[in-house]
Amino acid sequence: VNFPPLGPSDFTADLWGALQPSTSERGRGLRALCGSAYSLPLLAPSACERWLAEIAHARARAPSSDPPNSMHDHGVDLVRLGFGPRIDALLARLQPLLARLYPQFDGARLDSHHSYLVEYGRDLDESLAWHADDSEVTLNLCLGEEFSGAELTFLGLRCREHMQTRPTADEVRSFEHEPGTLILHAGLHRHRVEPILSGTRRNLIVWARSTHLRRGTPPPAASYCPLHG
């Protein structure tokens, strides 16, 4: 079963403002967080609830599978469950915004992705150590549910050469997730997940990738890494 793309009523007015080409509306609802990171209210509450229900239904019918990557003990690959077309359509809808925010990471030509659900809570993943993603740009969309803790902490954008360097005090910034709100960041922007204190948090993670960039010349580190000043 393939799940269809989300419809216009599933998205917030903030998304339409952020996608506007005119300067009068451009960026409405888009919030700069730190470095490469931004947040945007994306989905209506009903869309989040429906997506979680669809995921639960698909998981109940699918054979058990391994976690989506080596960092997580829980979660599921959403493409394997049939959500690939929906996520393809979501990336296409966001493409003008990604092109504008991430030109150095080929945001205009993100043509593949690894997409999965992460789950934090009691008897689920409780936190996540610092890391960078195997993506040009990462989309982190909170779908629910009720929870406290499990904040996303950023630790500075680095090239591969300087990935192990300490972050400055200004680079360490934590942000709470809110259901329906999307957080965007460069894949090389280091981050971790703080311990969850109560409830359950479920997020859609999309590692968006550019075949053109990966087959060609990588972006110059000086265009994004502060240690190449």
Model-identified regions with their sequence ranges:
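Residue-level marker of intrinsically disordered, low-complexity segments enriched
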Residues: 13, 31, 53, 74, ...
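Non-heme Fe(II)/2-oxoglutarate
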Residues: 17-107
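Fe(II)/2-oxoglutarate
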Residues: 1-36, 225-229
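Intrinsically disordered, low-complexity regions enriched in Ser/Pro/Gly/Gln/His and often acidic
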Residues: 9, 43-44, 113, 200
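Catalytic core of non-heme Fe(II) oxygenases with the double-stranded beta-helix
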Residues: 103-228
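Surface-exposed loop/turn and secondary-structure junction residues enriched for glycine/proline
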Residues: 14, 46, 74, 79-81, ...
